[in-house]
Amino acid sequence: MSEPRFTRPALWEDVLDLARRLNRQGARYVLVGGYALAAHGLVRMTTDIDIAVAPDPDNNRRWVAALAGLPDGVAAELAGEDDPFAGDLLHAIRINDEFTVDVMPSVAGVSFAILEQHAEQLLIDGEPIPVLDLQGLLDTKQQSERPKDQADAALLREALARLSPAPLLSPLDSGS
């Protein structure tokens, strides 16, 4: 009898491996969630990788093919489906492979088309990864009622405030 297999927490090496697979397939995706925060230097504990994907049939085939190549091949079950999100009330697919990948066509009501406009191409260990920018992360996090997302939103507001240029001072009124 074989040993039961369990999903382990995702590591940065897994993010890089996933990005390589998605890039090789030409998939349109954006890294969101905890690892997107970490890519910007805002580290908090996370155990899965969250990606948003363009929800069209061609791209669905591309990201499914990429994820089907993960060690346990769990995503292969989705091969051949033009719309793997059909009928999914939460509009998220959780791929519990060697590590967990949550795949979403939108995040907190924000469409992939909008998320893609807020993606920055970051080169991480030689791999280009489209990562949701700080403002995009804030926009999605503050839509959530989960305590960890509210904490992330507070951290993002602080980071954005620190990165903003100092406000311009208005000229002093000479009183005349």
What are these regions (language model features)?
Residues 1-176:
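Compositionally biased terminal segments of proteins
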